[in-house]
Amino acid sequence: MSYTITKKDIFEWCSYPWQSLISRTDLKVNLEVSADRKITMTKVGNLMTEEVIENNKQNKITKWVLPAGPTDQYDVFIDRVNNENISLKNLWIFHMDEFLDWQGRPFPIGDTYESLEGTMNSCFYGRIKDELNVPLEQRIWPRINDIDYADNLCEKLGGIDTVWAGVGAKGLVAFCEEPRSYCYHISEEEFANSKTRIVNINDDTIVALSQRTFGVCYDRVPPMSITVGFKVMLSAKRAVLMVATGTWKQTVVRVAMFSEPTLEYPVTFFPKYVPNVILYTDENTLDHPMSHEIRGW
């Protein structure tokens, strides 16, 4: 039977003072808390760098799943790669997702909001020295004209080393969101084995994205995407969750720390399937208003 979070559960999780969470031993994830977002993302950028360095020493390939946001950690990673001459020739990057228009077609590749590939070309690959950069054929994007490619390649390579993941307010990772339909149901097992696919973006995610960037102009956010599925991401040896967005994410971090796997918050699947799940967050995001006295005025 699928697990459902009760009001009692979520109210209790949100009531804990954030300081008390640091010493708890019953969390589903390993917790790394910093004073602010900058420190948090600097730690993540250094963690990325150290993984590549270690695998290069052992002459091993490195296999990642990367998001097109957040991007703060890439500043640290890119600076170290360029300054320390760290080769990325053995790095394979599976990109999480790409926006599609309302007819399910990709947008032109460019440094625009609608083009996640263009965003990564500009903010990531375009800032790395050519002689150190990831080879083009090792930059794997989900494509509507070859939808099984990423899944088949991931299996051929033996799975992922680390998923570096932002997390949505309702627990999305990539655009793997809670399935919502009155007419069909997906089991937790099916979701955990989900492949690369084309999806409609949930309405509340469109609201969140539009608030963040477009003054809550919903129509400015693309309504569809192509996303890698959990089959690729849950093949990882490690998942690093990067959540330092403040008020929008104060509840989802509590859910990630305490909940059993539930389709309502897909991020909760990671602790069940991935051996090492680390939540990097800051004090503001880890705090919660329900852990303080709340009045109506």
Which functions belong to the PLM regions below?
Residues 151-152, 173-187, 251-256, 291-292:
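A short secondary-structure junction signal
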Residues 64-73, 168-172, 246-249:
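Gly/Ser/Thr-rich loops at beta-strand to alpha-helix junctions
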Residues 159-172, 176:
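Hydrophobic, aromatic-enriched interface-forming segments
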Residues 77-88, 110-111, 178-188, 259:
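A glycine- and small-aliphatic-rich helix-loop capping segment at beta-alpha/alpha-beta transitions
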Residues 9-32, 39, 86-164, 220, ...:
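Ligand-binding beta-strand-loop-alpha-helix segment within the catalytic cores
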